Amino acid sequence: MAQDRKKVLVLGAGYAGLQTVTKLQKELSADAAEITLINKNEYHYESTWLHEASAGTINYEDLLYPVEKTVNKNKVNFVVAEVTKIDRNAKRVETDKGVYDFDILVVALGFVSETFGIDGMKEHAFQIENVLTSRKLSRHIEDKFANYAASKEKDDKDLSILVGGAGFTGIEFLGELTDRIPELCSKYGVDQSKVKLTCVEAAPKMLPMFSDDLVSYAVKYLEDRGVEFKIATPIVACNEKGFVVEVNGEKQQLEAGTSVWTAGVRGSHLMEESFEGVKRGRIINKQDLTIEGHNDIFVIGDCSAFIPADEERPLPTTAQIAMQQGEHTASNIKRLLNGESTQDFQYVNRGTVCSLGANDGVGIVYGRDIAGKKAAFLKKVIDTRAIYKLGGIGLAFKKGKF
């Protein structure tokens, strides 16, 4: 009977949550469960493309599509609402649009920027966090060029961009900027030699997930296109002028018209309010992706701190891991609905590619280093495959990179 259907509630339509739902609707009949997906926006956005929209090399509309295009309305109830409280013991979720009970819960609420308490960073630096922040940043950068061109008293600092962080997001954003800056200079008649791009990183090495050879390739590629790197240089504050850094124990002011922070993300702030043992918005999972004490609550994606059985540290938060967790969670939910035991999650690392603009990149694919146009092509394949897995061939054809 319909009233006896178990209530499966999925929070978040990012890579992890949407992958869970799309697999569930493929594998379950309409009367197998009452599936509800709650997301604060009516759209899903490709968060791995945010660096492109932030630089302005793609339009912000290119990276989003309606969630309704991916869900089967006969099997999934999609609700646009913001989650305000998760009561794990009462098995109830509160939103700004109403209250939802659950028998099985999937928490996939995504990430927000983490500034690690650096003074002034939230107030004075742009964050690459979502569609709105990316749109705001790209418009700001173009406005700086337009205003510089129109100004009689020109200040070259208006054309300077500081990027905090030399991890994935920071390097990919810089790569896009090296594509975008020549376009802006041509559009507004600006001398490109006046533009200054500076990347500041506290760690002694950028892109720590890659070999020294790949890092050297990426550094040379970006330096040849005007990027200056300040490695092993911690940012201690951010103000209206730019970053304050520490060099040899002394503080120095780096000035720029645009400051961008890319060096940290954390899981949703709701995690600390809803669960115990949460650090930076992430909770340690059991091997089947549920959490301690709750065999019917799965936490996946950016809110998950999954530690494989033979390892000591949690897996990083990547789209590849999130989608694999989503698929596995859907399979485990099906098992629970059938009265079966869940199975442990096994992550398959197929590789990682970091783009350097549209036509270059570095990466590791099944343990093998790749660089150049081959890496750039593979990045486009990965991006398009993600859309295909979530929305099917039609959406991949419309929104993919080919």
Swiss-Prot record:
Classification via Pfam families: Pyr_redox_2 (PF07992)
Chief location category: membrane
EC number: 1.6.5.9
Names of required cofactors: FAD
Function (record text): Alternative, nonproton pumping NADH:quinone oxidoreductase that delivers electrons to the respiratory chain by oxidation of NADH and reduction of quinones, and contributes to the regeneration of NAD(+).
Family per similarity comment: Belongs to the NADH dehydrogenase family.
Protein name: Type II NADH:quinone oxidoreductase
Species name: Staphylococcus epidermidis (strain ATCC 12228 / FDA PCI 1200)
Organism classification: Bacteria, Bacillati, Bacillota, Bacilli, Bacillales
